């Protein structure tokens, strides 16, 4: 399949995006998605502000684990579809406040992220196939960097007393945790994941934006020993500090147990439903590029970069 040429001024568009974001969140440290392919292993932090917790309500802490509660578990989250959720930097203005919602346990350890240059090693370590497009648009060139996130399982036991003490210590008001949620254990099974990126700088001191990313991960699952998805959503959305618009968008999700919210920068991107390889997907269009995400046969796929929506869809359809 031939992919048409495209020559956007990606650098100018990206500079404009950076300026708008930095203007609104100059006091905040870089987010996790700005450091997604680095040598540092990802760390699980207790849920932060209510807005952050609300956005992650359906997948409370993707990456957690199974320890002695399998017989009591009820599935509360296993995504097969996607919905856009409009967010702005101001929704996370207090993201530096970290609250302790309960005890986290790993089995045997937190997920690790490895950056590799060898595709065979990346495929072997992830257990996922290396995907190649039929052709690449001009401007998208190698070498390709590979990131492998290990499979992880773990558990979070929600604890009202710990949350209350953490909120008091940080000077933050939270609504009391209901008895139906207090003491529930959430078990999360996630990964592995494989990321292929074109155009990243080889220098760790020089920031760069990839021209193309192809990613895939096994569908994560979240199980609970007590609290239901509806109870978790209702409680988290009731917390002070959750923007009403954000809460309304999450409440509007018809089936939160099978739907993964995709945060979209407000005013910077639009979305639409599309068909990808015979299944429904979500296409994201922005001034500096485009992306598409879909799920098929228990794997979530994503393609994106400094390319047009038509090119994104052509690449997604040609993966082999």
What are these model-predicted stretches?
Residues 33-320:
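Intrinsically disordered, low-complexity prosegments and terminal tails associated
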